[in-house]
UniProtKB/Swiss-Prot annotation:
UniProt-recorded Gene Ontology molecular function terms: alpha-1,3-mannosylglycoprotein 4-beta-N-acetylglucosaminyltransferase activity; metal ion binding
InterPro entries the UniProt entry points to: Glyco_transf_54, MGAT4_A/B/C_C
The protein, known as: Alpha-1,3-mannosyl-glycoprotein 4-beta-N-acetylglucosaminyltransferase C
The keyword Metal-binding is assigned to this record: yes
The enzyme's E.C. designation: 2.4.1.145
Gene transcribed to yield this protein: Mgat4c
Sugar attachment sites: 84, 215
Broad class of where this protein is predominantly found: Golgi
Native organism: Mus musculus
């Protein structure tokens, strides 16, 4: 039998535990949610045996439902499913078929300036008739001010009626009732309350936009509502995607500013929407996108140059403050991505760390780096199949290492392939020309060379003290 003082002591302990439980509930739920998110991202990618998957799903569903944390989190046990939101169609016709690419824009009322119409105009004007058949543009008017939304819908329908009728342009709105709490949020990074509210709502705006676009196309690119596009950007994107066939990627970046020009597989959009919604109050959208990429095991940024999209807004959507950010890698005219057919690479230069030969051939922003090359050193590209080349361009050195260029070199092409124990190589070569200031370019190669090319070789014709960076090798075929 327990004595009175023992009972009193037990009740004191229980009371302390209740207080501790109250104080730790929020932090515990935060850890729980992160864990469940990771486990769902993990199991959706088929890394776990089916029996373990089912156990994890049942556990995660039970925990989330039992806590009833907030209404936003109720359905998050299935990250591959869309969020249950009833959208308002402000201007749209039914999408008759799935497109290749959806371009997503989210827009709110600005205190100064309005760039949305110019952004939509740029998307359509910079696309050819054939490209227009493969794109859809979804605009989320995310402001809760209905008068502003009505005015914007009127402007959009007047200027782009034919695109709406053709099913290329849809204007939607996610009602305020679906939004989580936006006031009284924690002030991470010591941001002022209005800034926290702005960026938190922006995360939810994009989450609902991504959720809507999950089944409209094969790929999705995220833009802001104050962006100018490069001419024929869709053709450039398709070329890049084709060049990465067989390569795992989560995010491709076609701009270096914020979340402009981030490209995703559409099948990843539900998970990304859930992710933004779950952590909406934690940090800005572009930071969350970086974490999402890492969670899905894409370690490095895959960014392409030149950029396809340029920020053009002068006044920010936050308080109308000045925003002069520009992408200095942007090019207005056609982004002529090289074909760079499949090939193998060989060099007898002393390679620095992991800057291997193949990196000079990639359209990603990386390069080959070799230590002080000697006369007679070579960098050889052997194509899987003989090709007809229209144009060749080779850049050496970088902006911050302008001395690491090929000071004395030449470029050769070969026809007949031979095999040895070490490498595949061509037995005879024809010299196309010399490098000038570390640069080589030649057009109409197919009119000057009477054979299909199986090998291409960069030769060092004089020893140099400086190291050598081959920044890019670009080949266009006919």
């Amino acid at each position: 039998m327990l004595k009175f003082y023992q009972m009193k002591y037990i009740f004191q302990i229980l009371d302390k535990m209740r207080c501790l439980r109250k104080r730790s509930t929020v932090s515990f739920l935060g850890v729980l949610v992160v864990f469940l998110l990771f486990m769902n991202l993990y199991i959706e990618d088929s890394y776990v045996l089916e029996g373990d998957k089912q156990l994890i799903r049942e556990t995660s569903t039970h925990q989330l439902n039992s806590e009833r944390y907030v209404h936003t989190f109720k359905d998050l046990s299935n990250f591959s499913g869309t969020i249950n939101v009833t959208y308002r169609y402000l201007a749209a016709t039914p999408l008759q078929r799935k497109r290749y690419l959806t371009i997503g824009l989210s827009s709110v009322k600005r205190k100064k300036g309005n760039y949305l119409l110019d952004t939509i105009k740029s998307i359509f004007e910079q696309s050819s008739y054939e490209e227009l058949k493969e794109i859809s543009v979804v605009v989320h008017l995310a402001d809760f001010n209905s008068s502003w939304r009505d005015a914007m819908v009127q402007d959009i329908t007047q200027k782009f009626a034919h695109h709406i009728i053709a099913g290329r342009l849809m204007v939607i709105h996610a009602p305020e009732e679906y939004y989580p709490v936006l006031d009284g949020l924690k002030r991470n990074y010591n941001d002022p309350e209005d800034r926290v509210r702005f960026r938190s709502k922006q995360n939810v705006d994009y989450a609902f936009l991504l959720n809507f676009c999950a089944n409209t196309s094969d790929y999705y690119v995220m833009l802001e509502d104050d962006v100018r596009c490069s001419r024929n950007f869709l053709t450039a994107i398709k070329k890049v995607i084709a060049s990465l066939e067989g390569t795992y990627w989560v995010t491709l970046e076609f701009s270096k500013l914020g979340y402009i020009g981030k490209l995703y597989h559409s099948h990843d959009l539900p998970r990304l929407a859930h992710f933004l919604l779950m952590f909406y109050q934690e940090m800005p959208c572009d930071w969350l996108l970086t974490h999402f990429r890492g969670l899905l095991a894409q370690k490095n940024v895959i960014r392409f140059k030149p950029s396809l999209f340029q920020h053009m807004g002068y006044y920010s959507s936050y308080k109308g403050t000045e925003n002069k950010l520009k992408d200095d890698d942007f090019e207005e005219e056609s982004f002529d991505i090289p074909d760079n057919p499949p090939a193998s690479f060989y060099t007898n230069m002393n390679v620095f760390e992991n800057y291997e030969a193949s990196k000079a051939y990639s359209s990603v922003d990386e390069y080959f780096w070799g230590k002080s090359p000697s006369m007679g050193d070579t960098f050889v590209i052997v194509f899987e199949n003989p090709i007809t080349i229209k144009k060749i361009k080779v850049n050496t050195g970088t902006e911050d290492r302008q001395n690491d260029i090929l000071q004395h070199g030449a470029l050769d092409v070969g026809e007949k392939l031979i095999f040895s124990k070490q490498i595949r190589q061509c037995d005879t070569y024809l010299r196309l020309g010399e490098f000038k200031n570390g640069y080589f370019e030649m057009s109409d190669v197919n009119q000057k060379i009477p054979f299909d090319i199986h090998c291409m070789r960069i030769c060092v014709t004089k020893t140099q003290k400086e190291w050598l960076i081959i920044r890019s090798i670009s080949i266009w075929t006919s």
